[in-house]
Each structure stands twice: as C-alpha cells, then as structure tokens.
Amino acid sequence: MARRAAAGLLRRHLGPLAAGETLQARGMYPKQYGAANHAFSRFYSIQGQQRSLYGFRTNVETDDTQQSARMNFEVQKRSFSSAAAHVQRNPAYSVLNSDDVSYFKSILGDSGVVQDEDRVSVANMDWMGKYKGSSQLLLLPKSTAEVSKILSYCNSRRLAVVPQGGNTGLVGGSVPVYDEVIISLGGMDKIITFDNVNGILTCEAGCVLENLSSYVENKGFIMPLDLGAKGSCHIGGNISTNAGGLRFIRYGSLHGSVLGLEVVLADGTVLDMLTTLRKDNTGYDLKHLFIGSEGSLGIVTKIAILTPAKLPSTNVAFLSCNDYISCQKLLLAARRSLGEILSAFEFMDRHCINLAMKYLEGVHNPLPVSPFNFYVLIETTGSDESYDKAKLEAFLLRSMEDGLVADGVIAQDISQASNFWRIREGISEASVKVGAVYKYDLSIPVEKLYDIVEEMRSRVGDMGQVLGYGHLGDGNLHLNILSTKYSDKMLAQIEPFVYEWTSKQRGSISAEHGLGLMKAEKIHYSKSSEAVQLMASIKKLLDPNSILNPYKVLPQSVL
C-alpha cells in the first residue's frame, strides 16, 4: 500500500515542463522570480540554478568619508541571550587623547578617522541592539600597511582595539565593550587574484561574502560557505569566527577551505602566510590559530580560499516528518542514498513554521494540508540533472515507503526553491518580531539534539515559546526561547541549565557563532582548564599587552 501511494504521488506530481524546456526559456532567472507559482510540483529538479539565500542584509553606503550600515528591516525589539558576565574596564589601557587622533589622521587622512557621534554610534552597537560600547573613534584603513601602523602605535600606547567587519555577529564579538578604538576593515575590499584552473580566490578581508559569491559564480565556482547574512558579512569576519553556515555538510569548515592568510599581529608585525598551495607540510600550520580566534590574536587582512566548482543541477525539497526519530533516520538515509550530491540538510520544528508563516511577508507553507511536528529542507547539487533527479526520486520513494517522510514537495522552479529557503532563513528574523529572544547556538550529538528543546519547554512552561531548528547534517542546533519581554526570571530558567546540559553531552556551547563577550566566561563548559590555560598562553605570547579585542573569547581570570 505504501509503495503504491508513493508511486502514485510521483506520477501525479512529476514536473510539468515539456521535453527540452528549461527554466531559462520561461524567464525564471535567479534574480527575476516574478510572481510565485503556488501550484507546487513535487519531485522535480531545478536545472542549472543556484538558490538565492534570504537573511539579514544591510545596505552599505560608502564614500571617501563614510561607511555605515542601515538595516533593511526595523528591529523593534531586543534579542537577549546569556547576559554577559559584567567585566571591569582594564585600568592598564590608556585613554584616547588628541595626540592619538592626530597620529591616526597622519596615516589615514581626515576621511579615515571618524569621530562623528552618529557614525561612531552605529559602529558601537551590534545589529541586534544588544551590545553597545562607548568608543569615541572609528578608523577606516584601506591597506595592510595602514593596519600595521595602527596596531604598532596602539600597542606602544596600550590603546585597546576591536576589529570590525560587517558586524553581523550574535555574541558581541565585533563591538567595543568600553572605549576600544574600532578598526573597520570595510575599506579593504579588493579581489586580488583568482586562479581559474584551481578555483583559488585571494582577496582582502573587507570583501562582502555575497559580492565574492557573485564574482566566483561568474567564473564557474561557488564560495564554500553560505550564510543568511551574506549580504553584509565580511569574509575576514567569517574567517575570524570560523563561520559554518548552510554548505558545511558538503564542504566542511573553513579550516579545510582556507589555504592562506595574511595577519597583522598586535605589535604591527605583518605575518605573511598567504600561500595558495593545497599541500604544504613545512612546520606548524599557523593559519589555523587565527581561524576562529575572533580577532583576539591578530587582525586578518588577506585571505586565500579554495572555491568548489559550481554545479549545474540543483534540487530543493521540503519534507515533513512525524517525529524527531524520523528526522534522524532520514538524515542517515540521505547520506547513504544521495551521497555526493547532498549539499544541505536543515530541520525545523512546527513552532518555527508557524512563526515564519505569521511574521514573514511573502512566504507560503509548502505543505499546508496537515500540520506536522517536524520539517526538513534538503538540497542537492550535482553535475547531471537526469541522474540527480532520478537519485532524489528514488530516495524520496523509499523514505515514504519506510514511513520516514509524511509528505513532501520538491521545488518546480527557482521561486519555489527560494520560498523554501526563505522559510528556513527567516526564522531568526521572525523571532525578533515577537519580543525578547534568548538565542543559543549549540553543537550536540544528533541523537540527543532535540532533547534540550523538549527539556527547555518543560522548564519555561507558559512563560515563553521554545523553537528548535538548525543544521541537522552537522549537529548544530539553534535554540531560541521567545518571550514578550526580557526578565531575570526567564533567564534563570534557561541558564546555566542550557550550558550544563550541553556540557554533559560533551557538546559545544558555540557551534558557529563564536564566544565573543557573551560566552567568554563560559568557555569551561566546552573546554578543559588545561586547554583554556594553553589558549591564554598563546594569547599572552602574541598579544602581551592584550590590546586585541579585549574581554572576548577567554575569561579575564586567565589573562
């Protein structure tokens, strides 16, 4: 019975395109979606198309004297998670004076030294409005040499600094805590070289990820990472936080994709590790110290990164499951059946879908007939459309027969695929519209991943709503607790329980967002005291005056 029903579903909903007809012939280009066609055709692949991600994006207006960000949507409520442990300003740091400003103007010019209160205020606050510093100075270097001179001077004066990219982080890592000098890398946005044979991109740290994606796609390649914030985040910030994102399951972490770095150390020394070699087994591979160190060991100024080939066939499926065990089994089945073409495996619970439908404009539920407990978004990319399509259809047929999938849709065209991704990527945006959001980014063994969501619902009760979603393919849970307003009572129900529970599972309290200010004092939940002490030793060696991004990453007690 199950096989007949599934086969019937395949026959009824196979894509309606005529033989030889392409999406291009219908005018369905990635940036020309037109009106959404809601008659979803199931089990159909998208030929030669790459999805376009939705997420938090900023418009950046730049001239000789200005570089500022304006959010495309208005964040009316604050987002809270883990009230950062209060830290005292380090009295060893100097206070900025007029002589300092004069020196910076001598190397950057007047346009590169920003003291305007409104413009500095934008750089002082994270995009969620949660963390706000009191810096009086924003510097806009345009070269590695200028960054080197800035750090050399600040180190000699013991002026603390905070490097800043697109400022899209969630843990307070890219904004000042007190009066640190802000060094924006946005003016360093040049593409240096691209190796068309090997797909190796060399660029400056201030390049916006989306711009790099467009550049390499025109060359027949893609960036190995893709984020909802790609319209505003910088590649240097991605490297410094070891950003994960939606392609992690296919291409792995940046530790595997980054071939070389140029980094400016605290004393102004330029550390040239900008190799483009795939193999180099000469001594310690120092670049890995700076990937994920959040600007606390040095400021990344240039990057050489390996970009995978852009594949012509893309499929996006939106599936429903009755329980979390089915999601786990579906992941295992996808890895076995889809193998090399599996490029994303995202999951969302029904609370996420309900929230997205309520607060996101222009999205439509692909499976509106019956509510389900869990939803899975699967993306495949490959080089042979007919092969990929047949492989995906066979996988879905078996999954329905085995009872792993309750219902499912595969996008017929790019607008439908974009709708699927808009739902997944828009959950964070929708969450903010409720009120206070307590956000946690956890790495947990897949079999235990949803247990913390259920435990949190029991603890929170009717005080708030708990959402669970994330990158199931790599065990990364985004746990969001929503409430109409922030309260100490709610926070007490969440913390330290969420960290203690994660630690007991030998998980990580930060899967991809970093530690920043928010979790610096909580690193012991994921790292041993010996490991933390070794990290502190490295920090003291490379930054003895501790001027680089202070109060972040490591507890103040070990420095």
UniProtKB/Swiss-Prot annotation:
Any GO molecular function: FAD binding
The UniProt record lists the keyword Transmembrane helix: no
SUPFAM superfamilies reported for this sequence: FAD-binding/transporter-associated domain-like, FAD-linked oxidases, C-terminal domain
E.C. designation(s): 1.1.99.39
Gene3D superfamilies named among the record's database cross-references: 3.30.465.10, 3.30.70.2190, 3.30.70.2740, Uridine Diphospho-n-acetylenolpyruvylglucosamine Reductase, domain 2, Vanillyl-alcohol Oxidase, Chain A, domain 4
Compartments where found: Mitochondrion
Keywords attached to this entry: FAD, Flavoprotein, Mitochondrion, Oxidoreductase, Transit peptide
Transit peptide, start-end: 1-80
Domain FAD-binding PCMH-type: 131-310
InterPro entries registered for this protein in UniProt: FAD-bd_oxidored_4_C, FAD-bd_PCMH, FAD-bd_PCMH-like_sf, FAD-bd_PCMH_sub1, FAD-bd_PCMH_sub2, FAD-linked_Oxase-like_C, FAD-oxidored/transferase_4, Oxid_FAD_bind_N
One record GO biological process: photorespiration
GO cellular component labels: mitochondrion
Substrates-to-products reaction catalysed: (R)-2-hydroxyglutarate + A = 2-oxoglutarate + AH2
Names of the cofactor(s): FAD
One Pfam short name: FAD-oxidase_C
Entry note: cofactor: Binds 1 FAD per monomer.
Family: Belongs to the FAD-binding oxidoreductase/transferase type 4 family.
Subunit structure: Homodimer.
Chain's role: Catalyzes the oxidation of D-2-hydroxyglutarate to alpha-ketoglutarate.
The protein's name in its UniProt record: Probable D-2-hydroxyglutarate dehydrogenase, mitochondrial
Naturally occurring in which organism (per UniProt): Oryza sativa subsp. japonica
UniProt gene name: D2HGDH
